[in-house]
Design a protein with these regions (language model features):
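Secondary-structure boundary/capping motif
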Residues: 12-15, 44, 79-80, 114-115
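N-terminal beta-loop-helix "entrance" segment that forms/cooperates
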Residues: 37-55, 149
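N-terminal beta1-alpha1 ligand-phosphate binding loop
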Residues: 1-30
Length: 208
C-alpha cells in the first residue's frame, strides 16, 4: 500500500513531522508512506479559474495515486493550523482528490490532550460536501507530551503508544482495503446504470 502523510503545520520543529517520520520508518515493511510538507503553499485565495498552484497540483496528484492519506495535526486554539485549513480549501475548491479517499487522522501536542480537539474539528471538516473523505471511524491516535516522546534517532519512546499506533495502523490498512473495494464497486455500478437505456430494457422484454 502507498500512503501520503501530510505534515499539518509549517512549524520547522513540529513533533507531528516526527510522528509521521516514525510511522514511515516503523511501518516500512507494511506500507510506503511519503511524508509531504505544506508550509510553502500560498494561502487560499479562491481563484476565479479554479486552478491550483503547482505545488498543490503535485500534492493532489500524489493523493490521487495513493491508497490513502494520513494527516498529522497539532492543535492551535482548539482547532487545526491555518496552513492545514488553507491546503484543504485549495483541494476542495480545485482538484478534489480527497473524495472517497481513506484518511487516517493522528496528532501530537506538547500538552496532555494530544490534539484531540483539533482532530475532532479536522474530521468534521473532511466530511464537508466538497471533500467527502472516507475518514477512519472509531480510532484516533493522540500523542500527548510529544516533546519528550522521541529520542535523538526519532524513535517513539512510549512503548504503550507504539502498541496503540500499531493497532490503529493495522485497522487503517484494513479500512483502506475495504473502502477502496467498496468505492470501486460503487463506481462500476454507477457507470453501468449511466449506460442503461430504456431501449435496452425494451429489448430485454422482447427477448423474454
Amino acid at each position: 500500500m502507498k500512503f501520503i502523510g501530510i505534515v499539518g503545520t509549517n512549524s520547522a520543529h513540529s513533533t507531528n513531522r516526527k510522528l509521521l517520520q516514525f510511522m514511515r520508518d516503523h511501518f516500512s515493511e507494511t506500507a510506503e508512506i511519503e511524508v509531504c510538507e505544506i508550509g510553502d503553499f500560498p494561502a487560499f485565495n479562491e481563484p476565479k479559474n479554479k486552478v491550483a498552484p503547482e505545488g498543490i497540483s503535485v500534492l493532489s496528484e500524489k493523493i490521487n495515486e495513493a491508497d490513502g492519506v494520513i494527516i498529522s495535526t497539532p492543535e492551535y486554539d482548539h482547532s487545526i493550523p491555518a496552513v492545514l485549513k488553507s491546503l484543504i480549501e485549495w483541494l476542495s475548491y480545485t482538484t478534489r482528490p480527497l473524495i472517497d479517499k481513506p484518511v487516517m487522522v493522528v496528532g501530537a501536542s506538547h500538552g496532555s490532550l494530544g490534539s484531540s480537539r483539533a482532530q475532532a474539528h479536522l474530521r468534521q471538516i473532511l466530511d464537508a460536501p466538497e471533500l467527502k473523505a472516507r475518514i477512519m471511524p472509531g480510532s484516533e491516535f493522540l500523542l500527548g507530551h510529544s516533546l519528550q516522546a522521541f529520542d535523538e534517532n526519532g524513535e517513539l519512546l512510549y512503548s504503550e503508544k507504539v502498541t496503540e499506533l500499531d493497532e490503529c495502523f493495522e485497522e487503517f490498512c484494513l479500512f483502506v482495503s475495504i473502502t477502496n473495494q467498496l468505492v470501486k464497486d460503487h463506481r462500476f455500478k454507477t457507470e453501468q446504470n449511466r449506460k442503461f437505456t430504456w431501449e435496452q430494457l425494451a429489448e430485454g422484454g422482447e427477448r423474454a
